[in-house]
């Protein structure tokens, strides 16, 4: 029941690994686990209805226009379904979001029942409000302690749909009336969340250190915040914010049915407890809970703001050269969900702020986690240690010398230690990168894993930490060099292709420098835009003069905002003498660039194979010619082919022009492509009944039925002498009286056009002869041509259309060619070759 927010959670793979390697680990049994959490959730409490501040809060919004609610609008319902994540963990019903999204026939029924449940809350079945709570260890060394687990509850999908619909409606009303305090960034639409709070916090702390002035701060942490908030206060919160009575009635009734079972899995053993009836705390795992919790703490912001105390941020209303009077913005707290930081100009001010927070917390029956509450103050630009005595008698200690506090994901002392945090992030980034590359993912999933698992550990720091350009480029190089270590990238391949999109011929990795600069731009734009209407943001923009990486005072575009778009990378790739040959081939008018890059877009090959094929396309394979003229090695005076000895050993020669392997390796590649066409036609005309993998398919010489006859590599006898009488495949359509002469060619890319013309010319005489001899209406010559590197000419699509076979058949043809070309090059280089770098 911990809330679901966007803050990074600390994870330790080493701890997890050691935990999994231990066999006999003591974990709580089902009774102990249930007993502990039942004490938390089955212990109902009631907030203080007589609190003085509550009387003020209950009248705050009375003059607002009442909330209009006549059931869930159908457009909201459909939008919620559309945005569901397909395979997110389901509840105890085990029905994933995917089925609710795709079974559109039942949408009207679901919509009808959702509105019925809201109108008549007692009709809601109990099982819909039942969850399964997974217990996630917080500390691998204290697995026996039930308190050291984080409860994550998976709710029924239908419950989450209802909650999402209500959340959108409630949030729309809250935003429309600007009810949520500006200091709260949890659940605030279009805000920058934790980054926004950290930027504001950095400006305050660094300005204080720079001016050698005073600031008194305290970190407040609630003890099991989401698990301890009273149900009575949750309902009162909705009433205070004027939420429609029908919605309140539904939620109030639903809360009485909240039930969950705890589930703890350790190695192969799974513990499932008896049900716990949740009478305190709030479920996590749905869209409504975070917003509901933020509303529960919203009165605290109003109470703190009403004190008119806090740290003074001077700013000018109009930041121009014209003399303008300074204004002051008093900031006394920042909130992100339940993470609270208080700010005072004096120690007494801080104590007043803490006292208000403590009183509010006591009135709503929530407790401070004293061990996680700390003071962290600066006096005359130096650390100042002081304690705070709570009304309960507990003592909040100061951060000691050398101690840090993890605030919104970052360790702070007087300020964030950029170097230490960057070193830690880089270490974690490399660890995740290695973890990904050790696994046997296909190419597309490898790139996706790097983009979504490794790089995001850096992303959160962009705009907060001061990353230099060379550091970001070094991180990008780390991806390349690590992939090279795992034989998944050639060290001399075109670097632009690594971060180009797959449809453009790249590998689809995120450009870390671009990502950083884009986030800087977005954050700067956000603060400048908010400064037009918000005094807080205006004050931050005014005071951030090279204090944070955003440098908000300067409105001119910063160097760390410049981005290199795809077109610039494509131009750089094109201008390269060697690497640029492939993209030059792709840009020829007879080549389908999109289809030629389809194998990359699909990403089905292993990354070793993909990396090797890109190296072949980039022409940086260590052939003898490459070693002599590009690497210019002194011992490479002879560049003649190691096989045929008749031509220079270039990569084009190896892939498609060496006479020594025409009847072996080239023929094997040719026959596999031909086999795909043969099997496709045989299945289409029901000459065979079973489909097998193309590399296992052995075509029969003749397949014949009453309507069709299919020849494989068979000589056609003619009455007159014809030189070319053995096409790869011959299809005789007896019904339509048409003969198709199908011939396969896999030339090097620069020979695509001439190969097509040669094939048409080659069988012209045979076509004329067969038309008369077989008494058919037409004889059509169908060349099936694609290049050795998988480049697809437009003529291939025309040929497939003439044969009336599926237009995407070219994908299998392309895959077969690429795999065989890689096999040919590997085999070729392994024969009497000097030391070469071969991937895969």
What does each of the following model-derived ranges do?
Residues 144-177, 193, 199, 223-226, ...:
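Conserved pre-motif C helix in the palm subdomain of viral-like polymerases
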Residues 265, 367-403:
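Short, conserved micro-motifs composed of acidic
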Residues 451, 475, 490-636, 821, ...:
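Extended C-terminal regions of large enzymes
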């Amino acid at each position: 029941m911990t809330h679901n927010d966007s803050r990074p959670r600390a994870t330790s793979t080493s701890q997890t690994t050691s935990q999994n390697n231990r066999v006999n680990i003591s974990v709580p049994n089902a009774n102990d686990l249930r007993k502990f959490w039942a004490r938390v959730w089955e212990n109902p409490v009631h907030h203080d209805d007589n609190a003085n501040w509550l009387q003020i809060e209950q009248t705050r919004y009375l003059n607002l226009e009442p909330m209009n609610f006549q059931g869930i609008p159908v457009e909201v319902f459909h939008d919620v379904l559309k945005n569901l994540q397909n395979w997110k963990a389901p509840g105890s019903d085990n029905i994933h979001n995917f089925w609710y999204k795709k079974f559109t026939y039942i949408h009207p029924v679901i919509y009808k029942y959702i509105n019925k449940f809201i109108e008549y809350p007692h009709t809601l079945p109990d099982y819909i409000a039942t969850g399964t709570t997974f217990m996630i260890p917080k500390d691998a060394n204290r697995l026996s302690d039930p308190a050291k687990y984080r409860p994550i509850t998976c709710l029924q999908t239908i419950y989450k749909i209802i909650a999402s619909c209500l959340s959108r409606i409630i949030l729309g009303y809250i935003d429309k009336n600007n009810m949520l305090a500006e200091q709260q960034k949890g659940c605030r639409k279009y805000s920058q969340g934790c980054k926004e709070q950290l930027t504001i916090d950095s400006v305050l702390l660094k300005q204080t250190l720079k001016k050698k002035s005073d600031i008194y701060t305290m970190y407040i942490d609630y003890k099991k915040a989401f698990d301890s908030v009273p149900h009575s206060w949750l309902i009162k919160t909705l009433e205070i914010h004027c939420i429609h009575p029908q919605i309140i009635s539904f939620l109030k009734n639903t809360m009485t049915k909240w039930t969950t079972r705890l589930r703890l899995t350790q190695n192969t053993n799974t513990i499932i407890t008896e049900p716990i009836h949740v009478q305190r705390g709030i479920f996590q795992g749905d869209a409504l809970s975070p917003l509901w919790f933020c509303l529960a703490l919203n009165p605290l912001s109003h109470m703190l703001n009403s004190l008119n105390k806090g740290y003074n941020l001077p700013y000018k209303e109009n930041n121009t050269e014209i003399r303008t009077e300074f204004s002051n913005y008093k900031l006394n707290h920042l909130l992100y969900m339940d993470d609270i930081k208080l700010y005072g100009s004096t120690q007494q001010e801080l104590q007043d702020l803490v006292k208000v927070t403590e009183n509010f917390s006591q009135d709503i029956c929530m407790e401070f986690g004293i061990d996680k509450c700390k003071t962290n103050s600066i006096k005359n630009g130096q650390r100042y240690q002081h304690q705070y005595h709570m009304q309960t008698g507990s003592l909040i200690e100061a951060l000691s010398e050398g101690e840090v506090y993890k605030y919104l994901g970052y360790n702070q002392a007087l300020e964030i230690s950029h170097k230490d945090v960057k070193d830690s992030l880089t270490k974690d980034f490399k660890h995740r990168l290695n973890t990904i590359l050790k696994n046997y993912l296909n190419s597309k999933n490898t790139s996706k894993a790097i983009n979504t698992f490794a790089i995001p550990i850096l992303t959160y720091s962009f705009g907060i930490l001061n990353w230099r350009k060379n550091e970001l480029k070094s991180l990008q190089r780390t991806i390349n060099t690590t992939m090279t270590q795992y034989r998944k990238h050639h060290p001399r391949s075109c670097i632009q292709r690594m971060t180009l999109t797959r449809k453009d011929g790249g590998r689809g990795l995120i450009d870390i420098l671009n990502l950083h600069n884009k986030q800087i731009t977005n954050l700067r734009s956000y603060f400048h835009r908010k400064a037009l209407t918000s005094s807080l943001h205006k004050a931050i923009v005014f005071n951030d003069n090279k204090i944070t990486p955003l440098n908000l005072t300067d409105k001119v575009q910063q160097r760390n905002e410049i981005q290199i778009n795809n077109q610039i990378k494509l131009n750089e790739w094109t201008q390269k003498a060697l690497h640029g040959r492939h993209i030059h081939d792709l840009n020829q008018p007879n080549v389908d660039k999109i289809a030629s890059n389809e194998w990359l877009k699909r990403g089905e090959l292993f990354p070793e194979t993909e990396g090797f094929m890109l190296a072949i396309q980039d022409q940086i394979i260590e052939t003898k010619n490459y070693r002599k003229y590009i690497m210019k090695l002194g011992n490479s005076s002879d560049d003649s082919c190691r096989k045929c000895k008749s031509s220079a050993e270039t990569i084009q020669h190896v892939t498609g022009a060496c006479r020594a392997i025409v009847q072996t390796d080239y023929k094997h590649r040719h026959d596999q492509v031909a086999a795909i066409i043969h099997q496709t036609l045989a299945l289409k005309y029901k000459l065979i009944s079973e489909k097998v993998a193309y590399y296992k398919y052995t075509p029969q010489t003749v397949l014949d039925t009453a309507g069709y006859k299919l020849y494989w590599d068979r000589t056609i006898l003619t009455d007159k002498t014809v030189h070319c009488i053995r096409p790869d495949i011959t299809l005789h359509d007896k019904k339509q009286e048409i003969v198709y002469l199908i011939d396969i060619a896999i030339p090097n890319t620069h020979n695509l056009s001439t190969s097509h013309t040669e094939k048409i010319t080659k069988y012209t005489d045979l076509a004329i002869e067969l038309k008369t001899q077989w008494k058919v209406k037409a004889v059509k010559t169908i060349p099936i041509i694609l290049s050795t590197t998988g480049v697809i000419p437009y003529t291939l699509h025309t040929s497939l259309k003439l044969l009336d076979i599926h237009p995407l058949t070219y994908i299998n043809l392309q895959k077969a060619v690429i795999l065989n070309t890689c096999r040919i090059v590997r085999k070729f280089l392994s024969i009497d070759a000097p030391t070469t770098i071969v991937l895969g």
